[in-house]
Amino acid sequence: LRITDGGFPAGTHRALRGYRIRITARYRYAFFLSSFLPFLLSVFLLSSPTLAQPTKAFKQAIPPYTFQFPQDHASHPAYQTEWWYYTGHLQSNDRIFGYELTFFRVGINPNPQPGGSRWRMHTLYFAHFALTDEDGEQFFHKEEISRPALDMAGARENRFQVWINDWSAELADSAAHRIRASADFASIALDLVPAKPPVIHGHDGVSQKSPGVGRASHYYSLTRLQTTGTLTFEGETFEVTGLSWMDHEFGSNQLTDDQKGWDWFSLQLDNNRELMLYVMRRKDGTYEPTSSGTMIYTDGTWRHLSLEMFEIEATGAWTSPHSGGTYPHAWRIAVPSEQIELRLTPTVSDQELGKNSLIGVIYWEGSVVVRGTDQGRPVTGQGYVELTGYKGRVPGL
């Protein structure tokens, strides 16, 4: 099954009459599951007694967990949700672009049975490709959805390779991450070489998202990936270089009903340091105490940051002409113990996603420029920011 830009297999149009699918971009914690998955199941899932009465549950992210690389780049189907997420900034002469390519694996049945129809669905795959033309102030995005039947989508357990149709990410023999995607607005063919080892977020291999056992993920990042390749855009092919960031998370049952959304930041400074921060926002307007971050140093070592160790202040706002949602649109970020004071500004105002989506989840995610001071010295940089729950509450995972 392939669903993209309104295309459906024969026989499903009657069930979907009145809807137009243009599901786009990335959903950091696969928050669309609670609203969209029942629909997918009702339309596509072949009935099975095993699905109705599972004999085991999906595995939860519980400490301690020791990452093993390169094995942990690969798929972890014992967990319900998993995503591989790439963002970066590409340059060719005077042109600058931001890009995003993300793959999701969503487990539906923790007890898949051997045999039966090849179309029986125990896993769904989603992929999102987005491009920000920073000079032209344009933003484009597309999503692919598929099941693993006939190898239309998949993620290997023995080595890192994930794909949907002709979109893919894999670990090459050279240890470079090789990513490929194409859409009507652009295509990319990039090789990403880590300049630093993987950074493990949280404590004991677990990044806690909300209180309670298992309400967490196993989460690591490659925070500085030297990037080369080609970008085809508006009929022209650019040889590009740049920096990318890769996240990989897997877990089950992470969020609570009390959480409305989150703000997430990945920042790459030009002094060879990086910063990741996220805050989970509750319905009463406060931050979840488990919100945290990670400071990454020039030598690849890192330091965990608890919520009280950093400050995030919105200094501007932007109201979407599409959804009417109002988002923070500029930020001051401080990490006093690291002597970091930063200002973030979006490269393009309108980087809102999901405005024509069937699932009805609307959020903002896009590239930002960074200016400020680090240890008393001027610093610049680049990053990506994700904002959810500002136009309606985000369903939980």
What are these regions (language model features)?
Residues T4, P9-A10, R17, S349, ...:
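Intrinsic disorder/low-complexity signal
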Residues L1-F8, R14, Y19-T24, A30-P49:
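Short, basic, low-complexity termini and linkers enriched in Ser/Thr/Gly/Pro
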Residues Q53-L397:
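Structured soluble/peripheral alpha/beta segments that form catalytic or ligand/cofactor-binding pockets
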